[in-house]
Amino acid sequence: MNCVCRLVLVVLSLWPDTAVAPGPPPGSPRASPDPRAELDSTVLLTRSLLEDTRQLTIQLKDKFPADGDHNLDSLPTLAMSAGALGALQLPSVLTRLRADLLSYLRHVQWLRRAMGSSLKTLEPELGTLQTRLDRLLRRLQLLMSRLALPQLPPDPPAPPLAPPSSTWGGIRAAHAILGGLHLTLDWAVRGLLLLKTRL
């Protein structure tokens, strides 16, 4: 039996190419991800978050009705009007969208801490909203990296948000945050879909 094994090894050594299965050629480049596919994924996440925000806004209005417009000075202003969509450029859109969503993430975190038991019935939904907002921000950062856009410097520490003066003030702040986030996400979906046609 040992003689047979040695004979097999000798024969294989005479044809080394047959002893090892061929592998991929060395140094073969990996296919780079398609930016349009990355943008599609970002749009899907943005649409999903838009729907989450819409549903949560409806729940907030049902549980805590508050007529009229509600503003919060610390919230970002809407990035662009619908009429100016044609002049958008991808780098500026992604940069501004990321900055605005970071602000909204901070406000949602503040709302969950500041309101406590007042918004307890909406806490699961607010927690889900915060998680998905963070996921979209990570997706935007990945998209900017894949498109080789300039890396942004770290954001300076934002001043802490003051606690609401009353429960009613907190409820008005919740309406302002969700309403502003809904408008921002709606604008983002429109802008990203338009910019996809230019890639």
From Swiss-Prot:
Keyword Protease (UniProt): no
Locations listed in the record: Secreted
Record-level GO BP terms: positive regulation of cell population proliferation; positive regulation of MAPK cascade
Signal sequence annotation: 1-21
Domain of life: Eukaryota
Region described as Important for interaction with IL11RA and for the stimulation of cell proliferation: 182-190
Pfam families referenced in this protein's UniProt entry, alphabetically: IL11 (PF07400)
Cited Gene3D superfamilies: 1.20.1250.10
A GO molecular function held by the record: growth factor activity
Keywords, comma-separated and alphabetical: Cytokine, Growth factor, Secreted, Signal
GO CC terms: cytoplasm; extracellular space
The keyword Signal is assigned to this record: yes
Site note Important for interaction with IL6ST and for the stimulation of cell proliferation, residues: W168
InterPro entries: 4_helix_cytokine-like_core (IPR009079), IL-11 (IPR020438), IL-11_mml (IPR020412)
Assembly and oligomerization: Interacts with IL11RA to associate with IL6ST, giving rise to a multimeric signaling complex.
Function summary: Cytokine that stimulates the proliferation of hematopoietic stem cells and megakaryocyte progenitor cells and induces megakaryocyte maturation resulting in increased platelet production. Also promotes the proliferation of hepatocytes in response to liver damage. Binding to its receptor formed by IL6ST and IL11RA activates a signaling cascade that promotes cell proliferation. Signaling leads to the activation of intracellular protein kinases and the phosphorylation of STAT3.
Family to which this protein belongs: Belongs to the IL-6 superfamily.
The name this protein goes by in its record: Interleukin-11
